[in-house]
Amino acid sequence: MSEGNAAGEPSNPGGPRPLLSGGRGLIGRRPAPPLTPGRLPSIRSRDLTLGGVKKKTFTPNIISRKIKEEPKEEVTMKKEKRERDRDRQREGHGRGRGRPEVIQSHSIFEQGPAEMMKKKGNWDKTVDMSDMGPSHIINIKKEKRETDEETKQILRMLEKDDFIDDPGLKNDTRNMPVQLPLAHSGWLFKEESEEPEAKPFSAGPKEEDMEVDVPAVKVKEEPRDEEEEAKVKAPPRAARKTPGLPKDVSVAELLRELSLMKDEELLFLQLPDTLPGQPPTQDIKPVKTEVQGEDGQMVVIKQEKDREARLAENACTLADLTEGQVGKLLIRKSGKVQLLLGKVTLDVTMGTTCSFLQELVSVGLGDSRTGEMTVLGHVKHKLVCSPDFESLLDHKHR
């Protein structure tokens, strides 16, 4: 078999054909590699694209099959076992081994169903406590659910107002005002037996009785014990009693009682702000004030008081009255009490009783912020004086 040339033509039998020179090759083509004896040249030895874009080749997309991996349970079990062995070794060495760990929960249902309690014997052994005793039972209190009728009935009872809140509410004598000293308050009384003493039986004959000879009967007295004799001879003890509530007394009755009493008593008399009488004369002087004028000079201006201010200054008060007798108290047959202040009549009535202790105190002030206080006595009753408008209107019409 004969060798072929680069064009693939058979060689002449006469002799070897000379090779083409490099000058005759096409421009842009790479020269063919020299032939090696004993080997054919490659099919893609030359560039057939002529400098263009390479042709795309189709390659099919093969979808790879996914295999689901199963969880490896054996590996996890081995890891947990190793961790347990490691924890046991740690508990066995060092200080504080076997310390109890407390886990606190917020509610009794948070931990779930309770497990069987186990007691640790040694490091590696556990003892079941099921045979030791009964398990703990949690008693849960059942809540009672109210029906709609019960709730409506409760609301009706709350809305009712036809009952008495305090049925035993009475005036308590312990809330009475305390008066000092206690010796004068009259809280100590003597208890005397109200039972009438038994009169001695007289066996003598009466005029109405029939004349019959009755033999004299003598009663033998038995000796008494010392305790019984001491009880009979003992005087009545002074018992502590609370005084009763004060009686509602009119002004006329109060004045009669005070007139018959030997001891004097103080009364609180409330008078109006303005009293009938002549106010003291006052020198009314105009008030001078300096005002700066437009020219910058100071000008003195006299200012007089308003009419209301002058009327207020002309009013008569208790401090303006002279010492001595101020008026007269009149007690009518009907029980009405009036106070005459000049030509003005004032009605006198009882004031509201106070639940606290009142005392009249005289205060004397000194020059250097010092003074003296003197208690004059207790004030028990209060009288209120109000103007009689009917008499005032009648006097005005006249």
UniProtKB/Swiss-Prot annotation:
Stretch list, region Disordered: 1-149, 191-244
Mod. after translation: Sumoylation on Lys-141 can serve as a signal to mark misfolded Pol III for proteasomal degradation.
Positions carrying Phosphoserine: 42
Cross-link (Glycyl lysine isopeptide (Lys-Gly) (interchain with G-Cter in SUMO2)): 68, 78, 141, 152, 160, 190, 199, 206, 220, 285, 302, 396
Pfam families cross-referenced by the UniProt entry: RNA_pol_Rpc4
Assigned keywords, A-Z: Acetylation, Antiviral defense, DNA-directed RNA polymerase, Immunity, Innate immunity, Isopeptide bond, Methylation, Nucleus, Phosphoprotein, Transcription, Ubl conjugation
GO cellular component: cytosol; nucleoplasm; nucleus; RNA polymerase III complex
MF terms in GO: chromatin binding; DNA binding
Localization (cell): Nucleus
Any one Gene Ontology BP term: positive regulation of interferon-beta production
Biased composition (Basic and acidic residues): 66-100, 116-128, 140-149
Sequence positions bearing N-acetylserine: 2
Keyword Kinase: no
Residues recorded as bearing Omega-N-methylarginine in the entry: 95, 97, 99
Free-text function comment from the UniProt entry: DNA-dependent RNA polymerase catalyzes the transcription of DNA into RNA using the four ribonucleoside triphosphates as substrates. Specific peripheric component of RNA polymerase III (Pol III) which synthesizes small non-coding RNAs including 5S rRNA, snRNAs, tRNAs and miRNAs from at least 500 distinct genomic loci. Enables recruitment of Pol III at transcription initiation site and drives transcription initiation from both type 2 and type 3 DNA promoters. Required for efficient transcription termination and reinitiation.
Quaternary context: Component of the RNA polymerase III complex consisting of 17 subunits: a ten-subunit horseshoe-shaped catalytic core composed of POLR3A/RPC1, POLR3B/RPC2, POLR1C/RPAC1, POLR1D/RPAC2, POLR3K/RPC10, POLR2E/RPABC1, POLR2F/RPABC2, POLR2H/RPABC3, POLR2K/RPABC4 and POLR2L/RPABC5; a mobile stalk composed of two subunits POLR3H/RPC8 and CRCP/RPC9, protruding from the core and functioning primarily in transcription initiation; and additional subunits homologous to general transcription factors of the RNA polymerase II machinery, POLR3C/RPC3-POLR3F/RPC6-POLR3G/RPC7 heterotrimer required for transcription initiation and POLR3D/RPC4-POLR3E/RPC5 heterodimer involved in both transcription initiation and termination.
Family assignment from sequence similarity: Belongs to the eukaryotic RPC4/POLR3D RNA polymerase subunit family.
Protein name: DNA-directed RNA polymerase III subunit RPC4
